[in-house]
Amino acid sequence: NWFFDNVCIPKIIEFKEIFKSGGGHFNQAIFNNDVPYIMNSFWVNFQKQHEFNPLHNHTGLFSFVIFMKIPYDYREQRMIPHVKISNTPCAGDFVFVHVDLMGKICSYSYPLDPSCEGLILFFPSKIRHLVYPFYNCEEPRISVAGNVWFKSKK
């Protein structure tokens, strides 16, 4: 399909170029040019204020999220009283969570606002991630997500 051929495959190639030198046997299997890929699943998320997607990962090899509609601004979200007093003000953020080489749990946040509409995040499916709730906005946050797998020989 058009999306897979024109968006996912170039992202896989880009990912392969960045990470081909590390990872030993794992990377040799994933980044072999003869390995075919397939988009296994594709869905749309509609989230209302106060809703969130807890820490999780996906099946498959790669996953992606496309932010279609961000009806709030993270700067305004940070000013909401219960968010402002937090030691980690992250209302409305998309966050990756990982463990560093020393075992420390680390996170990388994508603060979201309308300028992020159309942004595609493409990442290994096993990287854990979450989406924090947003507040004081009646419009839904809309994203499209999916998973890429190795294509079965069957």
What positions do the PLM features span?
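Catalytic core of non-heme Fe(II) oxygenases with the double-stranded beta-helix
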Residues: N40-F122, L130-Y132, E139-I142
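Compositionally biased, intrinsically disordered low-complexity regions
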Residues: G24-F26, F94, V148
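Double-stranded beta-helix
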Residues: A145-K154
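Signature of the catalytic double-stranded beta-helix
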Residues: N1-L61
